């Protein structure tokens, strides 16, 4: 879950993935089956586990913790898994290079219940609740930049605060009926509600100075100005619906699957957001005046977005697919073909998406699997895509479209008597009817028009295994490019063009003291091309073609985390004695050092416009 109105990386909160509840996670960069929905990019499937006996686990740290418990009846007919998490990143955020009071609090609760009535009927329920509160009171911020010949210093003084709230509730109740070994029916009833509030009123005054490179003494100020940012944005999203799925398996190697889904949506959006920039007696943007004269016109807002929208559309989708496993000589083959159709009555659009997958596992001494998949995929529009630059919902918006081809290889092998797995995926996507967007910090704002096309290609690799006997580690690397062509002006990098990324998780321990462990997490990624100052057109709206004239990439992202831990109890290698301690499956005490080398990373630039020179300073 990620809030819709989020604009700052500090507001993101916790991932919906709770490691205490998840059994397995499957990720695909594309080319997935028809039953997995309408998405143009990637697919993430999360499988929850069922406990087999009573269990209790917890984790505590200086920024929060989590507590989870699992229950199971003696006959295993009823199982329950419950988990709650809390996080407050005060200690981390207040170490930033700025005088700001932060009070971010994130909490959530998840539950997974199962009850097997008999061999034919089973019930289950998944529930999720989260509440994110983000309060920020900025005071002072100072940044030194420039060159040795022209050192600059920006001092910003703030007044006001930001107070945001994000609440989310969702649940799915499932009835599963299996009359015999060949047929299986599943009925899901689900509900979802998301309530978000983004309120801020912050006035800021800045002073841009230069210094004598020899003496270090300040010289006359370049610019003095002020800015007021104001927003009262509210969003309420409610979705209710049902889904019926059926699978027919005439034999263990063949599946026919069909599904129908009905959703009733309710979106209520109220937006009132504006920004005023002022400098020495005039506001910007401003009309041209002669040097030394003041602009006699009234203050003009740099931008103003206001809109009130309330829609209650209906979305219907269906899919059918066929899967088959068989032998071709000594080679194992898997094929899947399917088609998916969806209709949304808000824009009265129907989309049809054919897809196919083919995999072969040769009878080689090497354990390898090759897979090719592809099809036509759509990104069905929702709240962000349908909202235009005036704050209104656009009923003429269309689904973004892509044609995809994905090649994949899995290679399992042994090295120094330890098991390893290498996965590699190559993909190419030709995209059409794209909606241009820009990124302000982590906020994505769409233009509301299908006036772009593009393409993407890349390679992902991951090596997983026991680099050190008994503990798992992994290394991953990827290279990808994403381009778009807005109104036929030529190819340009999209704001999320990732390029190169490398990450590693490595675990080790002392041979004589295996209970003493250390882990190292290393991440490096090229900076995104979203470091461009947001340019406004004559109507005060973002100019999505401005990057054709100027585009700046953010600095590369670099981070190293180090963890130290002592395993007191491990029922596999370090069993505990005593009636009480023997009940513990694992007991570990550890210290995690985030960003161990204190590397400063840039998620986004805050651009300051020097009206005297016309330059933008990041």
Language-model region placement:
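Short acidic/polar hinge/loop motifs at secondary-structure boundaries
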Residues: 2-27
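N-terminal periplasmic accessory domains that precede
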Residues: 10-15, 30, 34-55
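Transmembrane beta-barrel wall of Gram-negative outer-membrane proteins
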Residues: 63-86, 99-138, 162-191, 251, ...
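Flexible loop and strand-edge segments within Gram-negative outer membrane beta-barrel domains
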Residues: 89, 100, 122-123, 127-178, ...
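Membrane-embedded beta-barrel scaffold of Gram-negative outer-membrane proteins
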Residues: 184-190, 197, 399-457
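Structural signature of Gram-negative outer-membrane beta-barrels, strongest in the C-terminal barrel
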Residues: 237-239, 251, 261, 302-429, ...
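Gram-negative outer-membrane beta-barrel transporters
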Residues: 326-331, 428-430, 449-535
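C-terminal beta-signal and adjacent terminal beta-strands/loops
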Residues: 470-473, 523-541, 566-618
């Amino acid at each position: 879950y990620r809030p819709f109105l989020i604009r700052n990386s500090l507001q993101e909160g916790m991932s919906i993935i709770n490691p205490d509840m998840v059994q397995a996670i499957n990720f695909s960069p594309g080319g997935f089956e028809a039953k997995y929905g309408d998405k143009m990019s990637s697919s993430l499937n999360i499988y929850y586990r069922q406990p087999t006996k009573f269990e209790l686990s917890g984790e505590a740290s200086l920024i929060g913790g989590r507590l989870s418990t699992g229950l199971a009846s003696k006959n295993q007919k009823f199982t329950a898994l419950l988990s709650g998490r809390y996080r407050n990143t005060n200690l981390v955020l207040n170490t930033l290079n700025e005088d700001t009071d932060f009070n971010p609090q994130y909490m959530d609760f998840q539950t997974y219940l199962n009850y097997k009535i008999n061999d034919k009927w089973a019930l289950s329920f998944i529930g999720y609740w989260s509440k994110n509160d983000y309060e920020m009171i900025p005071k002072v911020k100072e940044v030194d930049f420039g060159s040795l010949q022209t050192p600059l210093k920006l001092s910003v003084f703030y007044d006001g605060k930001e107070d945001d709230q994000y609440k989310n509730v969702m649940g799915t109740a499932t009835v599963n009926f299996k009359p015999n070994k060949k047929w299986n029916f599943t009925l899901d009833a689900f509900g979802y509600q998301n309530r978000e509030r983004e309120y801020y009123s912050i006035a800021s005054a800045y002073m841009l100075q230069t210094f004598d490179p020899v003496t270090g003494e300040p010289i006359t100020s370049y610019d003095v100005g002020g800015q007021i940012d104001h927003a009262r944005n509210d969003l309420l999203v409610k979705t209710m619906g049902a889904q019926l799925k059926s699978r027919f398996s005439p034999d263990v190697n063949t599946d026919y699957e069909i599904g129908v889904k009905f959703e009733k949506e309710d979106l209520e959006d109220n937006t009132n957001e504006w920004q005023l920039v002022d400098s020495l007696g005039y506001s910007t943007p401003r009309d041209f005046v002669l040097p030394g004269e003041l602009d006699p016109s009234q203050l003009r807002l740099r931008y103003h977005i206001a809109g009130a929208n309330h829609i209650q559309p209906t979305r219907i989708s269906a899919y059918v697919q066929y899967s088959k496993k068989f032998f071709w000589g000594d080679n194992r083959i898997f094929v899947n073909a399917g088609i998916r159709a969806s209709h949304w009555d808000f824009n009265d659009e129907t989309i049809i998406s054919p897809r196919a997958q083919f995999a072969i596992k040769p009878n080689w001494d090497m354990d390898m699997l090759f897979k090719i998949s592809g099809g036509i995929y759509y990104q069905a529009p929702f709240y962000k895509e349908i909202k235009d630059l005036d704050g209104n919902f656009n009923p003429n918006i269309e689904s973004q479209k892509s044609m995809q081809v994905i090649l994949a290889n899995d290679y399992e092998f042994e090295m120094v008597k330890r098991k390893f797995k290498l996965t590699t995926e190559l993909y190419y996507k030709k995209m059409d009817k794209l909606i241009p967007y820009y990124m302000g910090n982590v906020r994505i704002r769409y233009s509301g028009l299908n006036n772009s096309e593009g393409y993407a290609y890349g390679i992902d690799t991951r090596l997983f295994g026991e680099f050190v006997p008994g503990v798992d580690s992994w290394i991953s690397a990827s290279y990808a490019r994403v381009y778009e062509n807005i109104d036929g002006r030529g190819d340009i990098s999209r704001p999320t063009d990732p390029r190169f990324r490398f990450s590693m998780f490595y675990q080790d321990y002392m041979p004589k003291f295996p209970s003493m462990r250390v882990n190292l997490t290393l991440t490096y990624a090229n900076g995104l091309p979203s470091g461009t100052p947001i340019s406004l057109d004559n109507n005060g709206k973002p100019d999505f073609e401005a990057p054709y004239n100027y585009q700046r990439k953010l600095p590369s992202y670099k981070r190293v985390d180090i963890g130290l831990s002592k395993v007191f109890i491990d029922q596999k290698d370090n069993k505990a004695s005593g009636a009480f301690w023997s009940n513990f499956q694992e007991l570990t005490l550890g210290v995690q050092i985030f960003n161990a080398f204190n590397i400063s990373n840039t998620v986004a630039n805050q651009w300051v416009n020097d009206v005297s020179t016309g330059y933008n300073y990041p």
